[in-house]
Regions:
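Amphipathic, heptad-repeat alpha-helical segments
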Residues: 1-33, 75
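Short, charge-rich amphipathic alpha-helical segments embedded
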Residues: 26-38, 46-48, 52, 56-75
């Protein structure tokens, strides 16, 4: 479970690193901030060895990040 959570965290970070926050509309910015919050909490849970919580938060962040990325115009 630890590996799965870490993989989701890393996957989310890969997705959001290419997002230009200056081009986000308000709703997209809110989603971006939610993703960052989920990531932060997932990392905290991982550090606390709360693996189920870490995975759940990381998975939510991952799904939301991919949804956000799909909503952006192609480069």
């Amino acid at each position: 479970m630890r590996r799965e959570a870490q993989t989701r965290i890393e996957g989310t970070e890969r997705v959001i690193k290419d997002i230009d926050r200056t081009k986000l509309v308000e709703q997209q910015e809110e989603s971006y901030q939610t993703i960052q919050s989920f990531l932060s909490k997932a990392k905290e849970a991982l550090s606390a060895r709360d693996l189920q919580r870490a995975y759940t938060l990381a998975d939510k962040a991952y799904l939301l990040a991919n949804e956000l990325a799909r909503s952006l115009p192609s480069r």
